[in-house]
C-alpha cells in the first residue's frame, strides 16, 4: 500500500506570524498561503519523503517561496505526482509544509490520519533523526526524481515505426 503525501511551500513569515500569535500551524491553516500543493502517491513516510525534502532543500537553498515551489515540482516529478488547488482535495497520510524565507528553512510534517504534528525541524535536524540506509535521490549532484524513473516513453511524441513489407513483424 502506498504512503500518500502532499508537500506545501509557504513563506516563513506566516510561520512566524502564527507562532507569535500562538495559533495552530496545520495544513488547513496554511492552505491560503501555500504556493503549491504537490501530491506524491508513494513513500510519504518521514524516513523517505522527509529525507528527500531535507536533502533537496540543502541542495537548493533558495529563499523565495515561489521559486522553491517551482523547482520542487520540477525536481520531484514522477508519474504519480499531481498538483491540487487545495490540500484537502486528496486523501493522504502525511503533509509536509516547507517554510522558506528569512531565517532558517523549516520542514513541518503533519499526520493527517492522527491530526498531529510529527515534527517541525530544519533540514539538517530531519537528516539527523530520520536518515536510513536507502537509495535517496542525489539532488546535490543535480539528479531529479524523474531522472531515476524507468519509463517506457522517451517523449510525448508517438514513436515512428517503419514496417518492412517483406517481414511485417520486424519493426526495427
Predicted regions and their residues:
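Short beta-strand scaffold segments in enzyme catalytic cores
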Residues: 4-9
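Short acidic-glycine loop/turn motifs at beta-strand connectors
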Residues: 10-15, 32, 100-103
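Polar low-complexity intrinsically disordered regions
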Residues: 13-31, 165-172
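Short, solvent-exposed aromatic-acidic interface loops
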Residues: 19-48, 113-114
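Non-membrane alpha-helical secondary structure
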Residues: 45, 49, 119-122
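Low-complexity intrinsically disordered segments
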Residues: 54-171
